[in-house]
Amino acid sequence: MAKFEIKKIINRLVENLSDRSRDVILSRFGIGKDDYETLEAIGQRYGITRERVRQIEADALRHIKNPANEPVIRPVVNALNEFVKSRGGVMEESALKADFAVNHFEVKPEPSKKYEGAAMFFLHLAGNFIRTKEDDNFWPRWALDAASLKNQEGLVNYLIGQFKKEKKAVSLDEFMGWAKKYNPAPNPDAVSASLASAKNVAKNSFNEWGLISWAEISPRGVRDKAYLVMKRLQKPLHFTEVAAEINKAAFSPRVALPQTVHNELIK
């Protein structure tokens, strides 16, 4: 798997930009930073309008896309294409940039998270990806083509239909069994990418998958959490043991207190 010295590559691509244009590009994509900056934040720093920042960004990207930079850009874009293709041709945005940075960027000793924005930068330079906005059913996604989007949406809709039919949370193995009914030879990475893209499907602390609206998947209070741990262990438990099991499952950072569990169980 190719590992790119991404800091050197980025420096090469922005070295001929003006100081302001370089800063706008690095700030907008959050390259080497903890997060990206908005048009408004950059505009306030320079005393210019959001639209002017947008123009500077667009001009800088056009300059970077100069054919002379193609030998520098193309290897990373090719790796992006293959990476997304191996996951069914479409990935949720945050998973794509995080996973690609971990697998393909050499940035030590810095954390790869600081260079997730570089993946977004190259997605924009590639020019062949389709980006879909967040909607009621999916998070923002990047796809190689419309057919990949259609395939993912078909799989997700089928799996949601299975959940509504079976009315239960299932293990990943059982989930993959459903996927095989939709496609006899499913790509496990594509199925995982589909799950990451879907807003209405999630897994609980016991790695069981289901609809995010279900209490078994998104327990909302101590009573739901107590039900889940007792269902899983299938044996009588003292309320102090229930509290301990809830905390062990780490449903949330909030600690379950034995007295709270007791009060919920006797309601």
What are these regions (language model features)?
Residues M1-K267:
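C-terminal non-catalytic scaffold/interaction domains in large multidomain proteins
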